From Swiss-Prot:
Organism: Azoarcus sp. (strain BH72)
Protein name as catalogued: UPF0301 protein azo3459
Signal peptide: none
UniProt GO cellular component terms: cytosol
Sequence similarity: Belongs to the UPF0301 (AlgH) family.
Length: 188
């Protein structure tokens, strides 16, 4: 397969068992953008020891809407870990939004946090600190080295499953049992 021509926007990256980088070992990453210039995504199965209530206190915003306070904040990746990123549906219209498609977007502006805190909109959110980024050709090289499996994204996995079930659910979409994957990859 020519990985150089595959656009992985709105796909999951599943870290192979031999992933050496501890930031990505046993992770499921949602790719929000993939182009000739590189790729950007969020790790969606690594909650931090922080809730939205704590995050909102730290950024000095009220969290009045019900149902959000106990939700975890996620480690989105090793880039800009001091910045918040909100993966959400519906896409909506915010100041700094990367619209992946009509159903999902990635926003990094404060206005979405203000809306979540006051009105609870958008209702389906995954909030992370940091993101995963790849320079031009870097992700393609990692795919060629069998560092990742790819599968089209499923919003139900992101928004409806607890974080500890997301990796297994994505693997099941491929019909693969993670426990049976070899740590040694070969090339035919």
């Amino acid at each position: 397969m020519d990985t150089g021509s595959a656009n992985l926007t709105h796909h999951f990256l599943i870290a192979m068992p031999n992933m050496a980088d501890p930031h990505f070992a046993r992770t499921l990453t949602y790719i929000a953008e993939h182009s000739d210039q590189g790729a950007l995504g969020l790790i969606i199965n690594r909650p931090l020891d922080m809730t939205l209530e704590t995050l909102f206190e730290r950024v000095e915003l009220p969290l009045e809407a019900d149902g959000f306070a106990g939700q975890p904040v996620y480690f989105g990746g090793p880039v800009q870990t001091d910045r918040g990123f909100v993966l959400h549906r519906p896409a909506g219209d915010w100041h700094s939004t990367l619209r992946v498609n009509d159903d999902i977007a990635l926003t990094s502006s404060r206005d979405i946090l203000q809306s979540i805190g006051s009105s609870g909109e958008p209702q389906e959110v995954l909030i992370s600190l940091g993101y995963a980024g790849w320079t031009a050709g870097q992700l393609e090289d990692e795919l060629a080295q069998n560092a990742w499996l790819t599968v089209p994204a499923d919003l139900g996995i992101i928004f409806d499953l607890p974080p500890e079930e997301r990796l297994v659910a994505a693997m099941q979409k491929l019909g693969v049992d993670f426990a049976k994957l070899s740590e040694v990859a070969g090339h035919a």
